[in-house]
Amino acid sequence: MTTKRKPYVRPMTSTWWKKLPFYRFYMLREGTAVPAVWFSIELIFGLFALKNGPEAWAGFVDFLQNPVIMIINLITLAAALLHTKTWFELAPKAANIIVKDEKMGPEPIIKSLWAVTVVATIVILFVALYW
């Protein structure tokens, strides 16, 4: 059966997400994918520079020392930290851990994830700088 009646479609502006702080933060969090793509491309270029010898690597290091690139990389770091924070806050909601017939709160899980992140960062920096 077909109908000639046109269904009602509620109008939606392109700025619908700007009305509530929750949606603005959601769009900001999803926007952290763009700096992640930048870092991935930069890392791939660094690997190719490393493969192509000392001259290519020196050129890549010079590229990284450009003030504009340093600012972009700081923005990328901030975006990665924001993304990490939101994922760590989401993790306890996905894992129901029960201790002595009570559900564990989110704080120990979040603190554990940050502790693992800090330890892994220190180990990687130690190996990279002193090994």
UniProtKB/Swiss-Prot annotation:
One of its GO terms (cellular component) is fumarate reductase complex. CDD domains: QFR_TypeD_subunitC. One of its GO terms (molecular function) is succinate dehydrogenase activity. It is a multi-pass membrane protein. Pfam families: Fumarate_red_C. SUPFAM superfamilies: Fumarate reductase respiratory complex transmembrane subunits. The chain crosses the membrane at residues 30-50, 63-83, 109-129. Coiled coil: none annotated. InterPro entries: Fumarate_red_C, SQR/QFR_C/D. It is found in: Cell inner membrane. Its main location: membrane. The keyword Nucleus does not apply. Keywords: Cell inner membrane, Cell membrane, Membrane, Transmembrane, Transmembrane helix. Two distinct, membrane-bound, FAD-containing enzymes are responsible for the catalysis of fumarate and succinate interconversion; fumarate reductase is used in anaerobic growth, and succinate dehydrogenase is used in aerobic growth. Anchors the catalytic components of the fumarate reductase complex to the cell inner membrane, binds quinones. Belongs to the FrdC family. NCBIfam families: PRK04987.1. Part of an enzyme complex containing four subunits: a flavoprotein (FrdA), an iron-sulfur protein (FrdB), and two hydrophobic anchor proteins (FrdC and FrdD). This is Fumarate reductase subunit C.
